[in-house]
From Swiss-Prot:
PROSITE patterns found in the cross-reference section: XYLOSE_ISOMERASE (PS51415)
Record-listed Mg(2+) 1 binding positions: E232, E268, D296, D339
Lineage: Bacteria, Thermotogati, Thermotogota, Thermotogae, Thermotogales
Active site feature: H101, D104
Protein family membership: Belongs to the xylose isomerase family.
Quaternary data: Homotetramer.
Protein name as catalogued: Xylose isomerase
GO MF, any single term: magnesium ion binding
Gene: xylA
Subcellular compartments: Cytoplasm
InterPro entries given in the database record: Xyl_isomerase-like_sf, Xyl_isomerase-like_TIM-brl, Xylose_isom_bac, Xylose_isomerase
Pfam family, one: AP_endonuc_2
Length: 444
């Protein structure tokens, strides 16, 4: 089979001093940390949509990307070419997972029946390529936002016919995700929300969204799909207000409808930015709720108000993100999916590789720093000391539910001064810097 990327070699680890843009500086997939290869800690994944479908189009300009599969004019030939290119791409980068929307991998037909038949043909091609590869499916999902039929939403639409279409589309997406051995299935509600409350039945939409998710849970059980269901929060874009605004909002919704036991969260860095949170905040919220499932790895631009989906190169963000993953016990049915696209002006094929290499190196380095932070317990020790008052005396009684307002008033009413510990934020931020510098210095 002819190569799609003949000019790109298999990417090797060359160490931190390397200046080769097509080499890893910090990511050695077989490096063993805490008894496990680095690749199994990180579980990198390629996003089919950004890497093989995005062509550099934006609202102000035409496509710019030079892609080898664009030489195919027939939609099916192009779909098969993209699949073949995916496996070559993953193997050259030593990435073992990929993710997709149903409409990324196959074109739509005139009816859903025809579309499903087309999809089946592409799935067969993927299965054929999987036989000779170690590349696996991390998670699948359905695109319920691009087609005009979803202008009012999918599960939250005003049209029962559209609701039925969306349900049938998710049914098929679940089937092919199971068929391909996917570890999870993602629900992202890009059109599940509203532009104005003047024309919105908020109660009905939220109830229908719960009904939709409950049907998905029931069908997954029926077909024996044991992958992890994941909600991907995002506050806005393309819809003005989306119902899965952030982890806290989405968790409250799931809890309210008795669905929380079936779902975890797929946290995207840029979505946290849009919600006014840090990436770590969303990961921490998911972790303390026991709902940290997977990550869409990217970064946003704080000076822009939209989802820029840039490759992650901020070492502070990746360090603190991996710190939360480590504290959560690591990934099980999840991983680091690069929901990131090269910039429109980075239009060469090699830029696809360079972008992924940059992200993989940054997360690998972040993991190594985070591992040292977690192992040394530097933040844990400080936090434990800061909240020490709740480990003894009246504080312990508060935590154990052995006191009340009257007793607390009696305890405090004659105290003159309360001595508080210092937050020492500046010291802790400086300590984080020290760990970053020290870890890099110790690397070969």
């Amino acid at each position: 089979m002819a190569e799609f990327f003949p000019e790109i070699p298999k990417i090797q680890f060359e160490g931190k001093e390397s200046t080769n843009p097509l080499a890893f500086r910090f990511y050695d997939p077989n490096e063993v940390i805490d008894g496990k290869p680095l690749k199994d800690h990180l579980k990198f994944s390629v996003a089919f949509w950004h890497t093989f479908v995005n062509e550099g189009r934006d609202p102000f300009g035409d496509p710019t990307a030079e892609r080898p599969w664009n030489r195919f004019s027939d939609p099916m030939d192009k779909a098969f070419a993209r699949v073949d290119a995916l496996f070559e791409f993953c193997e050259k980068l030593n990435i073992e997972y990929f993710c997709f929307h149903d409409r990324d991998i196959a074109p739509e037909g005139k009816t859903l029946r025809e579309t499903n038949k087309i999809l089946d043909k592409v799935v067969e091609r993927i299965k054929e390529r999987m036989k000779d590869s170690n590349v696996k499916l991390l998670w699948g999902t359905a695109n319920l936002f691009s087609h005009p039929r979803y202008m009012h939403g999918a599960a939250t639409t005003c049209s029962a016919d559209v609701f039925a279409y969306a349900a049938a589309q998710v049914k098929k997406a679940l089937e092919i995700t199971k068929e391909l051995g996917g570890e999870g299935y993602v629900f992202w509600g890009g059109r599940e929300g509203y532009e104005t409350l003047l024309n919105t039945d908020l109660g009905l939409e939220l109830e229908n969204l719960a009904r939709f998710l409950r049907m998905a849970v029931e069908y997954a059980k029926k077909i024996g799909f044991t992958g992890q269901f994941l909600i991907e929060p995002k506050p806005k874009e393309p819809t003005k207000h989306q119902y899965d605004f952030d982890v806290a909002t989405a968790y409250a919704f799931l809890k309210n409808h008795g669905l929380d036991e079936y779902f975890k969260f797929n946290i995207e860095a840029n979505h946290a930015t849009l919600a006014g949170h840090t990436f770590q905040h969303e990961l921490r919220m998911a972790r303390i709720l026991g709902k940290l499932g997977s990550i869409d790895a990217n970064q946003g631009d704080l000076l822009l108000g939209w989802d820029t989906d840039q490759f992650p190169t901020n070492i502070y963000d990746t360090t603190l993100a991996m710190y939360e993953v480590i504290k959560a016990g690591g990934f099980t049915k999840g991983g680091l999916n690069f929901d990131a696209k090269v910039r429109r002006a980075s239009y060469k094929v090699e830029d696809l590789f360079i972008g992924h290499i940059a992200g993989m190196d940054t997360f690998a380095l972040g993991f190594k720093i985070a591992y040292k932070l977690a192992k040394d317990g530097v933040f844990d020790k400080f936090i434990e000391e800061k909240y020490r008052s709740f480990k003894e005396g009246i504080g312990k009684e508060i935590v154990e539910g052995k006191t009340d307002f009257e007793k607390l008033e009696e305890y405090i009413i004659d105290k003159e001064d309360i001595e508080l510990p210092s937050g020492k934020q500046e010291y802790l931020e400086s300590l984080l810097n020290s760990y970053i510098v020290k870890t890099i210095a110790e690397l070969r």
